[in-house]
UniProtKB/Swiss-Prot annotation:
SUPFAM superfamilies attached to this UniProt entry: Homeodomain-like (SSF46689)
Listed InterPro entries: Caudal_activation_dom, Caudal_homeobox, HD, HD_metazoa, Homeobox_CS, Homeodomain-like_sf, HTH_motif
DNA-binding region: 149-208
Protein role: Plays a role in transcriptional regulation. Involved in activated KRAS-mediated transcriptional activation of PRKD1. Binds to the PRKD1 promoter. Could play a role in the terminal differentiation of the intestine. Binds preferentially to methylated DNA.
Gene Ontology CC terms: nucleus
Superkingdom classification of source: Eukaryota
Region Interaction with 5-mCpG DNA, annotated ranges: 191-202
Organism: Xenopus tropicalis (Western clawed frog)
Protein name in the entry: Homeobox protein CDX-1
Keywords: Activator, DNA-binding, Homeobox, Nucleus, Transcription, Transcription regulation
Database matches in Pfam families: Caudal_act, Homeodomain
GN (gene name): cdx1
Composition-biased stretches (Basic residues): 203-212
GO biological process: positive regulation of transcription by RNA polymerase II
Region (Disordered): 42-120, 203-262
Amino acid sequence: MYVGYLLDKDNNMYPNPVRHPGLNLNPQNYVPAPPQYSDFPSYHHVPGINSDPHHGQPGGTWSSYTPSREDWHPYGPGPGASSANPAQISFSPSDYNPVQPPGPGLLPPSLNSSVSPLSPSAQRRNLYEWMRRTGVPTSTNSNGKTRTKDKYRVVYTDHQRLELEKEFHYSRYITIRRKAELAASLALTERQVKIWFQNRRAKERKVNKKKMQQQSQQASTTTPTPPSVGTTAGMGGLCSSSSSNSNLVSPSSMPIKEEYLS
């Protein structure tokens, strides 16, 4: 502040310079009564040098001790603090605190309750309980249907499967008339009978395809057959004939040999 600057500048005028307590404090921690210092019980003031009447007051009139520097809040000085008289204006920390803790009366009744009725996870679990899927089928109802992951699957009885298998071995493709008769006798719908025949044909194709693959693998893993005996005999005959021909001497070569001998 400006007054503090003058005091620091004119150190020669004061043998025992004592700063006014309001010059080093922030406005929010300033108290009207100046503190009492044990090191400076009183000091002499030369009248007429400074127009501030507070410098002439003895130190014994100071009644309270200001809080330590660690207790000060990091707030800057407010507007007009340098020109105002410390004895006329007082500040409190609550004036410079922008966020005030709300009292119990300011909160709505829903926020005053200590424990909420339901947590967010419990609410989410209750809202989406119907979306859960179970991997294990549930119990069968009276219509002979059971619930799987995302569709209904018909559970056939042993008698129904036996009659359907008999009909499938008789004819792989059932006619419309026979389908209606079989559905009426087995207490099924025509659509259920049709779907069973479709699934049964698909199963048969899968089994036949697997058998063909196994047969092809067995044929590829068999060892190759050795060469036949006739081929080896032919090869031997050719070799013997060639060796016998090599021992024979042509008649044209005889006189040539005789000429060389003579």
